[in-house]
Amino acid sequence: MYVIVGLGNPDKKYEHTRHNIGFDVIDALADKYNISVTDKKHKALCGSGVIEGMKVLLVKPQTYMNLSGESVAEVMNFYKLDPDEEMIVIFDDISLEPGRIRIRKKGSAGGHNGIKSIIAMTGTQGFSRIKVGVGEKPQGWDLADHVLGRFSSEDRAKVEEAIGHAMDAAVLMMQGETDKAMNIYN
């Protein structure tokens, strides 16, 4: 089984904000593959199903971003899965412009508190990830205000395209085609 985690914050007021782009990708995967992500367990909303013939668990941690690792570690431990081999984490990246995605096989947190938490709680940096660009904060803005803000209509259109790319990349990665996904989307 593969676990695909989308990072975000649980309150309704955060829906479709920059920081919740991971949730948006999970919702799009759930819609496309008819998976209900409504089971409340492991401090998350979870949904199991099949994507392109592979068993998958879609996960939206409900711990708030900075504690995402609590939920992720609980999921991986419960199912006895290796995060380095059986998990993809999807999250926002302010260093990428809206509409871009970047795939990594492993790496540091790069300043992202949700990823810091996952690394701390799972004990590894070796998990695959898909970063979805949300754009740099405007000069003089507070970072929290930027990532908790919504996209302009122009940027939202670009982000919708990126969500589709992130979904396609996740499927390729589950199929063992991470290098191919990187060549297409990075």
UniProtKB/Swiss-Prot annotation:
Recorded hits in InterPro entries, A to Z, give: Pept_tRNA_hydro, Pept_tRNA_hydro_CS, Pept_tRNA_hydro_sf
Active-site residues annotated for this sequence: H19 (proton acceptor)
Kindly list the places in or outside the cell where this protein is found, as annotated in its UniProt entry.
Cytoplasm
Entry binding sites for tRNA:
Y14, Y64, N66, N113
Q: List GO terms (cellular component aspect).
A: cytoplasm
* Enzymatic class: hydrolase
| Keywords, comma-separated and alphabetical | Cytoplasm, Hydrolase, RNA-binding, tRNA-binding
Q: Which reaction does it catalyse?
A: an N-acyl-L-alpha-aminoacyl-tRNA + H2O = an N-acyl-L-amino acid + a tRNA + H(+)
Give GO MF terms, alphabetically. peptidyl-tRNA hydrolase activity; tRNA binding
For biological process, the GO terms are: protein quality control for misfolded or incompletely synthesized proteins; rescue of stalled ribosome
| EC number, UniProt record | 3.1.1.29
Q: Where is this site: Discriminates between blocked and unblocked aminoacyl-tRNA?
A: N9
Sites marked Stabilizes the basic form of H active site to accept a proton? D92
Q: Which domain of life is it from?
A: Bacteria
Q: What is the protein's quaternary organization? A: Monomer.
Q: What does this protein do?
A: Hydrolyzes ribosome-free peptidyl-tRNAs (with 1 or more amino acids incorporated), which drop off the ribosome during protein synthesis, or as a result of ribosome stalling. Catalyzes the release of premature peptidyl moieties from peptidyl-tRNA molecules trapped in stalled 50S ribosomal subunits, and thus maintains levels of free tRNAs and 50S ribosomes.
Please give the family membership noted in the entry. Answer: Belongs to the PTH family.
Q: What is this protein called?
A: Peptidyl-tRNA hydrolase
Q: Which species does the entry assign this protein to? A: Agathobacter rectalis (strain ATCC 33656 / DSM 3377 / JCM 17463 / KCTC 5835 / VPI 0990)
